[in-house]
């Protein structure tokens, strides 16, 4: 294991407070946390692409006196199904996995979502440690306690709120990621900039290359991760179950989820969020909530790092149907998180279908 180095720790308040540790060489801390927890067994839920990292963690956990079970799941969103969750529960049952034992979610957002859901449901809730390895999972899926699986009706419609015991964000993993993963994950960071932290936007505008640099030296990514997690941690610490404030984290997500549903989840989530932010920015501009410079600021920041700013034309009816299924809707009205300025958030409730189509056409290609 490489030497442990902690860059930042974000404390998330709430009914079950926890810490998000951001640094490098964090396996030692993960093992220490599990060994001191009173657990007898640890179940590492991971995808095939994480086999090597899981084996390294396995050896360290065994050396610390813990029994280790591997929950091997399919890559990407294919693993977020009731069938796969059921297989995990069967394996936990076969291992006599108890209330004091711990699940570790190792991998991207799909793995951490599934690990959290499996842990939330097993014996009505066992502990989960999240170890995100993609940028998207680091700043979004692994933090906040939302867990879930997908169904034919939509993404994450079946799930639970289950806060992690701890989150370990190891920036050494960034160097192993394809450029496309760094770019896609950046969309969620940019989202937190628009809703709460203008410094994030300034960093992307002044040096976009440093915001994508995977090697830590000279990179803005560690600071961006810390800033984004700080925003999310502050929000979910006040509103775990999305009764009010937490909804602001869904900026750009109503249209994004419709895109993902239409694309059968083949689109990267971050790419869909980028297009979703362009959609809501255009709708907000049309309704007089934001000015033209803020609309253009969305486009320029996203485009500067290679995120999509438009979507396929001729798909409005399918996308509209997807938006009507969104979890945030109330009384049959489609609801959007919107801006009036950077850091100033409002809601749009029940916009006309004509206005929605106009916003869609503005980003169609």
Swiss-Prot record:
GO biological process: one example: chorismate biosynthetic process
Keyword hit for Cytoplasm: yes
Protein role = Catalyzes the conversion of 3-deoxy-D-arabino-heptulosonate 7-phosphate (DAHP) to dehydroquinate (DHQ).
Similarity comment: Belongs to the sugar phosphate cyclases superfamily. Dehydroquinate synthase family.
Query: What gene is this protein a product of?
Result: aroB
Binding-site positions, NAD(+): 75-80, 109-113, 133-134, 146, 155
Q: Which GO terms describe its cellular component?
A: cytoplasm
Q: Which UniProt keywords apply?
A: Amino-acid biosynthesis, Aromatic amino acid biosynthesis, Cobalt, Cytoplasm, Lyase, Metal-binding, NAD, Nucleotide-binding, Zinc
Pathway assigned in UniProt = Metabolic intermediate biosynthesis; chorismate biosynthesis; chorismate from D-erythrose 4-phosphate and phosphoenolpyruvate: step 2/7
Chain sites annotated for binding Zn(2+):
188, 253, 269
The reply to whether Lyase figures as a keyword in the UniProt entry is yes
Cofactor(s) the protein needs: NAD(+); Co(2+); Zn(2+)
* Protein's recorded name: 3-dehydroquinate synthase
Catalysed reaction, written as an equation: 7-phospho-2-dehydro-3-deoxy-D-arabino-heptonate = 3-dehydroquinate + phosphate
Q: Which InterPro entries match?
A: Dehydroquinate_synthase (IPR050071), DHQ_synth_AroB (IPR016037), DHQ_synth_fam (IPR030963), DHQS/DOIS_N (IPR030960), DHQS_C (IPR056179)
Per the record, the domain of life is: Bacteria
Q: How is the cofactor bound?
A: Binds 1 divalent metal cation per subunit. Can use either Co(2+) or Zn(2+).
Extract one GO molecular function annotation from the record.
Answer: 3-dehydroquinate synthase activity
- As recorded in UniProt, its EC number(s) are 4.2.3.4
Which EC class is the enzyme in? lyase
Cellular location(s): Cytoplasm
């Amino acid at each position: 294991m490489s030497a442990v180095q902690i860059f930042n720790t974000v404390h998330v308040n709430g009914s079950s407070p926890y810490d998000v540790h951001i640094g490098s060489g964090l396996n030692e801390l993960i093992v220490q946390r599990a060994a001191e927890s009173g657990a007898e067994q640890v179940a590492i839920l991971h995808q095939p692409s994480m086999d090597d990292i899981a084996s390294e963690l396995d050896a360290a956990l065994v050396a610390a006196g813990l029994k280790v079970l591997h929950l091997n799941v399919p890559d990407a969103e294919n693993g977020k199904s009731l069938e796969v969750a059921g297989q995990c529960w069967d394996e936990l049952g076969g291992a006599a996995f108890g209330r004091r034992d711990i699940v570790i979610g190792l991998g991207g957002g799909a793995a951490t979502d599934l690990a959290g859901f499996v842990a939330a449901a097993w014996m009505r809730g066992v502990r989960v440690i999240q170890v995100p390895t993609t940028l998207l999972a680091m700043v979004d899926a692994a933090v906040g306690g939302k867990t879930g699986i997908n169904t034919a009706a939509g993404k994450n419609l079946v799930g639970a709120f289950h806060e992690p015991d701890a989150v370990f964000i190891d920036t050494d993993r960034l160097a192993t990621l394809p450029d496309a993963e760094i770019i896609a994950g950046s969309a969620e960071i940019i989202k937190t900039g628009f809703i709460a932290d203008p410094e994030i936007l300034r960093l992307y505008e002044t040096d976009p290359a440093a915001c994508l640099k995977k090697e830590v030296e000279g990179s803005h990514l560690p600071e961006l991760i810390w800033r984004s997690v700080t925003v999310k941690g502050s929000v979910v610490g006040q509103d775990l179950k999305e009764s009010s404030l937490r909804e602001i984290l869904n900026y750009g997500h109503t249209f994004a989820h419709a895109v993902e549903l239409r694309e059968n989840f083949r689109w990267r989530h971050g790419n869909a969020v980028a297009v979703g932010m362009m959609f809501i920015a255009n709708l907000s501009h049309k309704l007089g909530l934001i000015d033209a410079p803020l609309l253009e600021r969305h486009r320029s920041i996203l485009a500067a790092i290679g995120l999509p700013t438009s979507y396929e034309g001729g798909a409005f009816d399918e996308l509209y149907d997807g938006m009507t299924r969104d979890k945030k809707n109330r009384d049959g009205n489609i609801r959007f998180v919107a801006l009036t300025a950077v850091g100033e958030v409002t809601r749009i409730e029940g916009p006309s279908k004509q206005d929605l189509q106009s916003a869609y056409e503005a980003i169609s290609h």
